[in-house]
């Protein structure tokens, strides 16, 4: 076959292959990130009257029973977040390192063999939100243990920013250590829709004495 004819044949085959690939459905970063992220928000456990930035024995007992609740209700998290324990919080007029939330979620992290992301300040909700909105968690379960007023701010902001109703997120009562706020972010084709639901751990009434 003459060289020119060979070249024409090769060109025709190459053009045909390129056309065939062009007809295939494309996989874009947006489609790769489609899915539903479940963000489970829990408050720290019960605290002593003086605050101390710490849990009391009842809060400790709650934290020890939390892993079973999380696994049965939601499954095993892909990531766990708690505020930076080096941040100080004022309790009864005294400033203490704020370890309550981390102490609450630490048994869960240990039970599941997970690290705790604890590098964000307790009031830096914008930074926490940005981490939670990372497309790496598009199909993931994420557990967040935090201060209850900041959790309400976070949940309302997530709802507002993702086509949800921020007013659907109620105030978190000061005596409620059992609540679970669940925000789901459903991503599809570059759009994100948020939904909210409130649940309960079912762990009230734990012993007021610490385990031996």
Task: Give residue ranges: language-model regions.
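Bacterial N-terminal signal peptides
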Residues: 12-23
């Amino acid at each position: 076959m003459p060289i020119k004819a060979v070249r024409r044949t090769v060109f025709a085959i190459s053009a045909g292959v390129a056309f065939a690939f062009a007809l295939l459905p494309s996989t874009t970063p947006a489609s790769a990130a489609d899915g539903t992220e479940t963000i489970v928000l829990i408050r720290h456990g019960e605290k002593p009257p003086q605050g101390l930035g710490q849990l009391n024995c009842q809060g400790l007992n709650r934290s020890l029973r939390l892993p079973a609740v999380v696994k049965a209700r939601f499954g095993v998290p892909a990531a766990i977040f708690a505020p930076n324990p080096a941040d100080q919080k004022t309790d009864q007029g005294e400033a203490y390192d704020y370890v309550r939330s981390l102490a609450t979620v630490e048994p869960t992290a240990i039970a599941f063999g997970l690290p705790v992301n604890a590098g964000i300040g307790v009031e830096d909700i914008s930074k926490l939100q940005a981490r939670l909105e990372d497309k790496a968690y598009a199909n993931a379960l994420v557990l967040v243990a935090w201060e209850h007023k900041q959790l309400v701010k976070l949940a309302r902001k997530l709802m507002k920013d993702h086509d949800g109703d921020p007013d659907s997120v109620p105030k978190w009562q000061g005596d409620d250590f059992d609540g679970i706020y669940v925000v789901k972010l459903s991503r599809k084709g570059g759009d994100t829709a948020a939904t909210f639901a409130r649940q309960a751990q079912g762990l009230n009434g734990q012993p007021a004495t610490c385990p031996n």
